[in-house]
A protein has these predicted regions:
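A short, proline-enriched helix->beta-strand linker immediately N-terminal to the Walker B motif
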Residues: 171-175
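Catalytic Walker B motif of ABC-type/P-loop ATPase nucleotide-binding domains
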Residues: 177-180
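Helix N-cap at the start of a conserved alpha-helix in ABC-type nucleotide-binding domains
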Residues: 188-190
């Protein structure tokens, strides 16, 4: 990994390749994410954005390349082209450094809001209930939903459910947050409250990778923007530069279509 001062990147993805049903979904994607980076990943549907995100925490399995999370190797490819993952327990531990928020919220419907937050810290991390509850309540307060602590997800709006999902991911105290189109399933009037929550995390210097269709959010909140098309990173630059003067014709065409 490139040494920037005393730190190394939180995530290094090198030449990630993935095939699916005979087609190449990812064609050699490389990206480094440093502490405090907020990276927006944009691009047309089917460009591999979500697949790449899901490869980072092993929800998808890569066919070739290297994934290093906080200096620990999750997957690597040998000289013969064989891709190997860290042993399962180790892979799980490495992936716990990353919190994930999905398009579809994925809250446990049979648990209250508070129970949704304390479940994983108790079962996965083995933390005591008494220690977890104050932290969970603080996170609910942070996303503006402490009053809903005893409600069930079905009683919440989509925007509220997604904010709970963000709080639930944060309850595991990750170093990196991955967002997979967090507002795509929401009614337009509810996207703002979710984006405000993500913006607040950016202000607190949480390291984030956000796959999004929200161009204003990508331009205003992210430190850099990655444009993907057809399984490749076409352009990765500081947000202001990419939006004001895209270097690649495909980026330009996409932005003209979106803005």
């Amino acid at each position: 990994p490139s040494m920037k001062g005393e730190t190394f990147p939180l995530i290094v993805a090198r030449d990630i390749r993935m095939h699916f049903g005979g087609s190449d979904v990812l064609k050699g994607v490389s990206l480094e994410i440093d502490k405090g980076d907020v990276i927006a990943v944009i691009g047309p549907s089917g460009s591999g954005k979500s697949t790449f995100l899901r490869c980072l925490n092993h929800l998808e399995t890569i066919d070739a390349g290297e994934l290093v999370i906080e200096g620990e190797t999750l997957a690597s490819t040998d000289a013969e082209g064989v891709c190997r993952y860290a042993p399962e327990a180790e892979a799980r531990r490495i992936c716990r450094k990353m919190g994930m928020v999905f398009q579809q919220f994925n809250l446990f419907p049979h648990l209250t809001v508070l129970q949704n937050l304390i479940e994983a810290p108790m079962t996965v991390k083995g933390m005591a209930r008494d220690a977890v509850i104050p932290k969970a309540e603080a996170l609910l307060d942070k996303v503006g939903l402490l009053a809903k602590r005893d409600a069930y997800p079905s009683r919440l709006s989509g925007g509220q459910q997604q904010r709970v999902a963000i709080a639930r991911a944060l309850a595991m105290e990750p170093d990196i947050m991955l967002f997979d189109e967090p507002t795509s399933a929401l009614d337009p009037e509810l996207t703002g409250e979710v984006l405000r929550t993500i913006r607040q995390l950016a202000d607190e210097h949480m390291t984030m990778l956000v796959v999004t269709h929200e161009m204003n959010f990508a331009r205003d909140v992210s430190t850099s923007v990655v444009f993907m098309d057809n399984g490749e990173i076409i352009e990765a630059r500081p947000a202001g530069e990419l939006f004001s003067s895209p270097a690649h014709p495909r980026t330009r065409a996409f932005l003209e279509h979106m803005l």
